[in-house]
Amino acid sequence: MTIAERLRIPAEIAVAALVAYLIGFWFTGLFPGYLPKIGGLWSAISAIVVTQATRRETTSSASLRILGSAIGAITSAVYLTLLPFHPLGMALAIFATVLLCTAVHIPSHARLAAITVIVVMVTGSLDPKLSQGLNALLRFIESCIGTGVAVLGVRLWPGSQLDSSDNT
């Protein structure tokens, strides 16, 4: 493996995280009070989680991220619409989310869905006057921003491989 090949993935991840952070920060900043730094953070985390060694692995990771984030955002939004934040309630929402993922035969999405529950519930608790539904939607969109940046970045990056058997 050449030095360029060894540096490609770290560079892809760093650039994707930066671009996703900036876009997420800007986007969430359009909604006063909804914490643009959290929007940037969540977008960057998504880009890091989704970026993989190959295009195929990145695409697969992207589908996990989007569906998992949607399930987690919906579960936490429903909980926070009915009840205020509480750590035990968060654990209950995580349990329900993982159970739902398992019940609909997508257990591989459960971890990312559970992480989304935590992020939505904790950020929502920072200012309970804000709309919990909008907070959950923003966290989902930020996840999509990071995911999109990662997929686009891997597809456009020179030397990115389609799969692990590629030599290009």
PLM features: residue spans?
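Alpha-helical transmembrane segments and their membrane-interface boundaries
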Residues: 1-117, 122-168
